[in-house]
Amino acid sequence: MVYDAAEATGLAPHAVNGVLRLVLIGMLAVGSFGLMSAVLRSAGIGRSGRHPAVVLYPMVLAATLVAGDHYSPITSYNVVLIGSVILMLAAALWVARDKDMVQRRLAWHEPVAMLGLGAVLAATYDLTYVAPPFVAAFVVARAAAGSSARQLLRMASVRRWTYLTAGFLAVFIPARIEIARRCSGSSCYVASDVELTTDVFGRTADRLLTGASPAGWRYTAGLLDRAGISFGFADLARNVLLIVLLAAVAFITVIAARNARGSLPVVSEDSVGWRRPAASLGALGAVTALLPALLVGLSRRTQEVRPQVGEAWRETIMVQVGWSLMATAALVCVFGIARKPGTARIAAALATAILGATMALTLLANARLTQVDRVTPLHAITSEMATAAIHFDPTESGNARRCRLIDDYTAILPNPRQWVSGPNVWSELDELMLSVQGIPYCDPVLHGGNKPANPEIEDAS
C-alpha cells in the first residue's frame, strides 16, 4: 500500500508513511476522546463539550504520546500497532453506546454483529487479546460514572459484550492452542510465546511506567546523549511550530477559563457529583494501561530482551492512552474542588500552562528522536534503498547500486533470524520488485552472490 501510494504520488515511502502516521494518530485521538467523553457524559458532565477537562483532553493526550524509541508504535509498524488500539477503542464505543446503557431488548442483528466483532478482535493481533476485559472495563466505568450501576447486569451493553466475548473466545482458544503447540516445537512467532515466571511482575511494572511521559523524556534524553545531540531547549524560542503551538495553547486557555464558570456548577449541582466520574475515569485509565502492560510482561520475548523503562514497545501506545485518561480524571478532581468561578479560572489557566509545557517537551523529544535517526548510517541506507525502489533503474549499474545498498544494510543487521535483517529485507524487496517491475531488486547472479535462505524470524520489537 505504501509503495503504491509512493509510486502514484512520486513521494518517498517515508513521506507517505508520515502522512499515514498522522492519519492514524488522528483516528487514535478521536477514539480516545470518545472514550473519555462517554464516561463523563454518563455522569452528566461535559454534555455540551464545555467542561474544562473535556476541552483540555487533546492536550493531555498529545503530552503523553512520547515516541520513546526508533521502533515505537508512533515511529514504526503504525498500521498494525496503532490500528489495533483504534480497533479496540472503536469496539468499546460500539458495544457501549448511549442507547445501550439502559435495559432494552437486543435487535436480531446485534448478537450476530457482536459475535463477528469478537472474532475479528481475536484474529487481528496479539495486542487485541486484551479487548474483552478492556471493553468490560469501559461498560462498568460508564455505568459507575452515572447513577445506574445497580442496573449494570440488565443493560443492553452487558449482553452485547457477552456476545462479543463469545465470538472472541471461539477464535482465541483454538488459535492459542495451535500457537502453544508450535511454540513447544520452537517454530512459532517468538513474541507470541507466553511464560509465567516471577519476572512477569517486574516487566509489567516497567511497561506500565514506560507509558508515562517523564519516562519517555528520560529515555529519549539518553538516546540523544549517546548520539551527541543536545535536547535543544535553546531552540524552543526559534521553533516556528512551537510558537504556533503556544498560540493555540493560549487560545485554549481562554476558552477553558471562560467555560469554567458555566460548566463547573453543572458538576457540583448534579446528583452524581464529580467524585464518581473521576474515580470511574481513573479506574478505566488504570485498566487501559495495565492490560497491555501485563500482556507484554507475560511474553517470553520481553522477559529475554528486558526493554528499559521508557523504551517504547508494541503496547506503549495503549498504555499512554490509559495514562491520558488517568490524568484527565485528576483534572476532573481539580475542577470539582475548585467550585468558585475565580478559583476555577485560575485552575484552568494553570492546568493549561502545565499541559502546554509538557506537550512542548513531548514534541521536542519526538523531533530530536528523528535527528538521532538521521545521524545513523542505518537511516541513511534505508532511505536510499526506499528511493531506489521508487525510482527504479533496471540497468546493470542500477542493479549493482541496489545490491551495494543491500550489502551495506546487511553489514549493520546481519542476523537472518531478525525480521528487519538484511537477508529478509532483500527477500521482501525482491518479491515486491518482481510483482511490480518483473525483475528482482538485487539480482544475485549479476551481483555475484547467492541469495540467503529465509529462516524462522524473531520479533524485531
Predicted regions and their residues:
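Intrinsically disordered, polar/acidic, low-complexity terminal segments
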Residues: M1-A63, A137-A279, P341-S461
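Hydrophobic residues within the alpha-helical transmembrane core of Major Facilitator Superfamily
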Residues: V19-L22, V95, V120, L294, ...
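Membrane-interface micro-motifs in multi-pass membrane enzymes
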Residues: G49-K99, A123-T128, A289-A330
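Hydrophobic cores of alpha-helical transmembrane segments in multi-pass inner/ER membrane proteins
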Residues: V85-W94, A131-V135, G167-A170, V244-I252, ...
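Hydrophobic alpha-helical transmembrane segments and adjacent interfacial helices
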Residues: A92-W94, E110-A122, V140-A141, L291
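Membrane-interface alpha helices of multi-pass inner-membrane proteins
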Residues: R104-D126, G167-A170
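Transmembrane-embedded, aromatic-rich helix segments that form part
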Residues: D126-R142
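Charge-enriched interaction surfaces
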Residues: P277-L294
